[in-house]
Amino acid sequence: MYDILIKRARIIDGTGSPSFWGDVAVQDGKIVGIGNDLGLARETCDADGLTLCPGFIDSHSHGDMMFELDPSFFQEVEQGVTTQIEGMCGISAAPFSETHLDSALEIAATVVDCDFLQSAGCRFDYQQYLDHLEHIPAGNNYVLMVGHGTLRAFVMGMDDREPTSVELQKMEETLHQCMEAGALGISYGLQYPPGAYASTEEMVHLSSVAAKYDGVIAAHVRDEGNHLLEADQEMIQVARSSHCKLVISHHKAINQPNWGKSQKTLSLIEQANQRGCNVYCDQYPYTASSTGLKSRIPQHLHSLGENQLISLMSDPEQRSMMQNAILAGMNPEQRFGTTMFGASPAHPEYTGKMVLDVARDLQKDPCELVMDVLCDDHL
């Protein structure tokens, strides 16, 4: 007798073959039979014509910060996702350094509340972090990347400079340890400090470490808009020089004037593969993106630290300088015209509202509103 029998399902087996109708038997957590009239089971599920297929792989996720908050991953499982690749965009939950803990938490705050992360207990060693995850009853499978921003902060904090030879060696050694522990590779978030401060050469050195383990590099490239082609070319050069597989994360062309550039970037990928590289990309099928509001602050200012940034935005004499710096880094044709508040701990009433609409209701300049929210939320 089987443990589970799923009957009358439209089966897609994942091989590329046409779908077919049948039953699936499960024993000890494994599929042991596919066909018709398979026999009895302790539990029978009548699919009644629904589709039964292998679980989907979410190739770009930030759920590694949420294991202890909601290990069921119900939202993912409900959509058929059974495996998640975590630690993307240069952000991972390990390794953390006691010396630069504030920097690591600042990076992690892009995707999770830092108060929660601290209360959960930061795991400083990558192997310790993986061992800890083994004891959490997660609702699906997961594969972990090492975030370059987290790795860089582990060694040198949020400094806007090139690493010394000693610091670069420390990053390489730490990445070796992470790969030995079971990491899939290294991810880059080149629009977010401190990853944004890395040179192409630094990435080649670190990617070469991942390549020794047949790993992969995933990159949120430096620019997804006006300089998209140059940004993709940089990462292809990193892949070529390091002999490492590359995935360009959420491949897209931001802002309507840049629509159509994806044809050129896809051509770059095809040409790279014809020359012997292994370059891939993932994407999502809608014209939107999601990131922290803090990303509106120019990269070169992030090295000042959160407290200094809040001080600058709160000081009437410095506020106009900050406003000009923020606006200078945005597309003049759009700026905050397409920006929506996804969440704000200090202002939950803004959730789901457009920045321009809230600014109009409050009779505030949109950029002034954004700076107020950043200060109130402590970035």
Residue ranges and their predicted role:
Residues 9, 24, 29, 49, ...:
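Divalent metal-coordination and catalytic microenvironments
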Residues 59-67, 156-169, 192-198, 363:
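Active-site mouth loops of central-metabolism enzymes
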Residues 154, 163, 174-302:
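Functional cores that coordinate and move charged inorganic groups
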Residues 5, 25, 58, 85, ...:
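Structured core elements
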Residues 69-184, 277-279:
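Divalent-metal coordination cores built from histidine and acidic residues
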Residues 1-40, 48:
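N-terminal metal-binding scaffold of metallo-dependent hydrolase/deaminase domains
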Residues 96-118, 129-130, 149-161, 242, ...:
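Polyanionic/metal-chelating signatures
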